[in-house]
């Protein structure tokens, strides 16, 4: 099916976007009338080669004539009128600039294709995909769009005024040459001299009018360039800078509000207006060559106008070259900007000027620490080589939205070894996880006679040689992007700035919300603030140093705050993600707060919290119970670590957890998850059902079923030490458990025996918990 026919079948929201593609520059009626022929032409090639553009343009006029003949036979007066008007407009505007119409048509076809892809993606995702244009438009962005519309209108108005000036100049030139061809005016008779003087006066009046119009156009061009400069400043210094800051935030787990499509449309629109204005300035030079005179404003001002428009366009192209996706190892998508030597990483660059004629024209080269002066200034800084496919040509086919981009998928870093096989200098001023490096992308643009060198670079990356360095490397990325928007400060950690608790709290919450469905609550953050800053009432504005966050050990602990928290994040993602997403894990809570909220609850109420003493990350549960005298007791079990959770899910541990009292009776102390959720309701769906266990324990090829086993965690207690808990589960051998002889006979008759593994260590029943 033809592309145009597919577009007609889209929903209204997409058709509205289609209408926005077309204007008087390329009327939608013409797209409708000549749809098959238009789609059969190579407009992108024509936009880059003038001879082919001229041929296609004349063929376009011929197709219009043929369509007009068909409308004539159908007696369709309205279509005849519209088509005649369109042809006259195209001839007047593009006859001498066929590459311009080719570029406009090529862009429209690319935008149409992107629109179809967007609609198809939305359909595949059940209609849930939202188009970037549906994003919220701020008041500032509305003003920007109005300024862009004003620039486009002024460019078109100038185009019409240039034609008027050209026509007036042609009339003046014709009359002047006609008068001059009559011979030497001084030798004419009196009557002829009178006529000549009259014609001379007319020429003088025409020249005065021409001079006024030229001055008006020069003045309008100067004003237009100032308006373009203002819009460009808004785009580069505000919108693009805001996007880059949002990208920094997204890299460290913040909201992923980094779509570039709208910004690309704005920059492309401005670039098109600038190129059209440059052609208008060149047209002034042509007019000057035909007619010039003393005090000609074109002679005085055109060179400056040419210099300004070229400088504006160069700067716009340079700012439009961005890193769309920062370097990231595919195995660690949630931790970009940390790269391990010898491991592939990916990155993507994009040019936010979508000119189809640039497709497959720009070759991108990648290097690292190109401007290595700052890096080399740091004693002992490592140097690296980039291996893999480090050059690529930008194209529009690989991206889903037709943007001009290049994605590098097979890059690796290798450290340059010095003579002793180690770092360049053992007296390094920074540890390796504080070294920052820049990956640079370079290319050259040749467009309409201009050569523009483009260069952009990634955010600073940390290069590690062992995956155990990942936590500290990620802490460096967090601290850098939290506290600065300077994209090239590789010396940042020579004197790392101080952060506030408000900044740190937001970033810490992002570490959970970016990889799970739940961030940190105010109460959880307050507990973390207390661990970092000590007891306090209001932590807002409190300062936190880089060393306190990542390098110094916490009070009474042999590890830093960040190492402890990072292992908890890893624990959540790998072992207890579903429970965290449900909100069942209170996680970070002080012991005082824990005791306060549980002491008013009925026996059997429990909560889940993270261990404060486990460097590798641990989780425990605390419950309330009554002792023999009826006094309320708060008990905690020794934390479960990743090693234990590898063997048994935390939900199954909770569901099967028992206490063995002095009479060897097993009792479950866990009844209600705080505040009052029945244990089975909260955790039952995350455990295997009895029917699943039975089917797994039964061998269909065996004459008799296997004996069924069940692993549970048991804590032994005694009347003498009940109040000395927290209790520590330890491992004991598997035991065959029977209640009494009659129960055993009944079980044997049914062919089922239950084997229970108790987790206990009798020699350390009374060991105090490290929690």
UniProtKB/Swiss-Prot annotation:
Assembly information from the UniProt record: Forms a homodimer or a heterodimer with a related family member, such as STAT1. Interacts with OCAD1.
Note: Involved in the gp130-mediated signaling pathway.
The protein's name: Signal transducer and activator of transcription 3
Keywords from the UniProt entry: Activator, Cytoplasm, DNA-binding, Nucleus, Phosphoprotein, SH2 domain, Transcription, Transcription regulation
PROSITE patterns, alphabetized: SH2
Motif window: Essential for nuclear import: 150-162
Any one of the GO CC terms: cytoplasm
Organism (species): Gallus gallus
Family: Belongs to the transcription factor STAT family.
Record gene name: STAT3
